[in-house]
Amino acid sequence: MPRTVPIQDLRNIGIVAHIDAGKTTTTERILYYTGKTYKIGEVHEGAATMDWMPQEKERGITITAATTACYWAGKQINIIDTPGHVDFSVEVVRSMRVLDGIIFIFSAVEGVQPQSEANWRWADKFNVARIAFINKLDRLGADFYRVYDEIVKKLTIKPVAIQIPIGTEDNFVGVVDLMNMNAIIWLEETLGAKYEIRDIPEEYKAKAQEWREKMVESIAETDDTLMEKYLEGQEISTDELKQALRKATINKQLVPVLCGSSFKNKGVQPLLDAVVDYLPSPLDVPSVVGINPKTVQEETRLPEDDQPFCAYIFKVVSDPYAGQLSYFRVFSGKVQAGSYVLNSTKDKKERVGRLLLMHANTREDITEVAAGEIAAAVGVDAATGDTICDEKSPIILEKLEFPEPVISMAIEPKTKKDQEKLSQVLNKFMKEDPTFKASMDPETGQTLIHGMGELHLEIMVDRMKREYNIEVNVGKPQVAYKEAIKGKAVAEGKFIRQTGGRGQYGHVVIEVEPLERGSGFVFENAIVGGVIPKEFIPPVEEGIKEAMENGVLAGYPVVDVKVKLFDGSYHEVDSSEIAFKIAGSMAFKEAAKKASVVLLEPIMEVEVETPDDYVGDVIGDLNSRRGKIMGMENKGIITSIKAHVPLSEMFGYATNLRSLTQGRGTFIMKFSHYSEAPQSITEKVVGERTHT
């Protein structure tokens, strides 16, 4: 199926917002008015087309970035619907890698909310053009002008209103179009499908003129020719304004602001017009740059069909019918169903089975995908962030860096049968979601799952049950403590067993001393004169290592220690490898007791970003968690705080930070080092271990 829509007529857009700002509702209206659906799906009825996972329908929030194609004014709009909940912001980030433009939706009541601020920063990072839609103008407490001011104060890039509302709350009926200086009034009885263009109501004329003036001035400031005309008082045509605004939007100089109420079906068609008029096509954005794995040189790929094929996989999902679906955006060239491609990230050849154009969770088979287009492939073994390309012209696009999981919990399958299925399912989840990890705790033997927040892990456990029929018990995670010695000590281990026939004899003398944190284990053989034959030396080391696995204080592994074997004796007949192994183990346990053992706890490097208003509260809270503030940096209205905090004090922190900062703080956490635990913590941990 060759290209049906020229590349300049494509718009790859995302719809991004804080949870509950009306994002999925707006998407539903777009699909309705572009003729993709025949009935409007309401989120609160659990019927929205784009929210297709059972968990989404129940919770009324969007978890997976569903993608769909629709058509408006002769242009194809590929929409990626993204979640607003902070636990799922990874979906937003990976979608941005493949978008050319974004509609940011703000609630006219709540204004610029934390997740929107965070997502706006991501859009800055990925250099994505955007338009803003102030939604929910029908709601009690709605105020377009207050929210517009918040956008000015809280976000980068200057907003420019191209509409203002007519009426508010229950009296909201339409908008003033500042480009054409007329009123658009929606007809209730047609579900907003029809509207009338009227003259601006008398009482809005002065306000409309004032905001039109602001708009023209803002646009003229971005274009020298228009600025001259403006200063000389010449008339600037609507076409000139639109062209200049398109250019300024694509260059991230301005953000056009529109308004409406998606739920009441008002404002959606002009929003679609704005997507077509102001957001870029794949030709308007910088060409993609990657690394050639053979030459390790940077290469640029132009968004043209005759360039070598290269695409970026931004999402992987397991489909109950089709198997693994890999969503991808083609940056150059084209790919046919049934052809072979190179997964350059893994250096592995793959066959593209089927190619699908997606509409939420229904699909249409296609034969070819070309530059600028978004589709899903069946049969490609890939993970999120992989590049697929023409094997003759390999290229690797930048891999996304995802935040490390910040919360873990132990899970245990309820039946033996589920145990076998569980590891396959966990592997599938890890491929789909780079912020989800699963591991086995070698010390406790528990399976641990790690994610971005409690809701994230809840939903994963829920999916195990719904999609794969695996039931698990969920527990609290354990902290992986370690033990270390503080001083030097000498001890001997003697294992002598005399029974009928051949006996057992092993005798060693060792010295232990502490090493620097992170040094691990050093074994020194200082035996001279053959007091212990050399074939018995490795078993001694093995016995010591085994004893180190279960420390003498609370049974945690002993680390950072040097052991010197310097004396001992053997018996011509009775000595054996096993006897020396046991002697080595006995000697180490004895020496460790003498060398005063301490408990080590894992210390995490925590970086918190918070609006300035909450810095005091955040620091106070970190101090109360035995945190040590390592540094602070002011980034405009946000302050970044770095601290070292024991892992045991960080459970529940995500929820706590949210309430401390009204949801506006974010944090990342990674392992830093092990450090000696205070006496009170040691006593508590030892007490818990000896009672279990």
Swiss-Prot record:
GO terms for biological process: ribosome disassembly. GTP binds at residues 17-24, 81-85, 135-138. Pfam families: EF-G_D2 (PF22042), EFG_C (PF00679), EFG_III (PF14492), EFG_IV (PF03764), GTP_EFTU (PF00009). Gene3D superfamilies: 3.30.230.10, 3.30.70.240, Elongation Factor G (Translational Gtpase), domain 3, P-loop containing nucleotide triphosphate hydrolases, Translation factors. One of its GO terms (molecular function) is GTPase activity. The keyword Nucleotide-binding applies. InterPro entries: EF-G-like_DII, EFG_II, EFG_III, EFG_III/V, EFG_IV, EFG_V, EFG_V-like, G_TR_CS. The keyword GTP-binding applies. Its main location: cytoplasm. One of its GO terms (cellular component) is cytoplasm. Residues 8-283 form the tr-type G domain. Keywords: Cytoplasm, Elongation factor, GTP-binding, Nucleotide-binding, Protein biosynthesis. Catalyzes the GTP-dependent ribosomal translocation step during translation elongation. During this step, the ribosome changes from the pre-translocational (PRE) to the post-translocational (POST) state as the newly formed A-site-bound peptidyl-tRNA and P-site-bound deacylated tRNA move to the P and E sites, respectively. Catalyzes the coordinated movement of the two tRNA molecules, the mRNA and conformational changes in the ribosome. This is Elongation factor G. The gene is fusA.
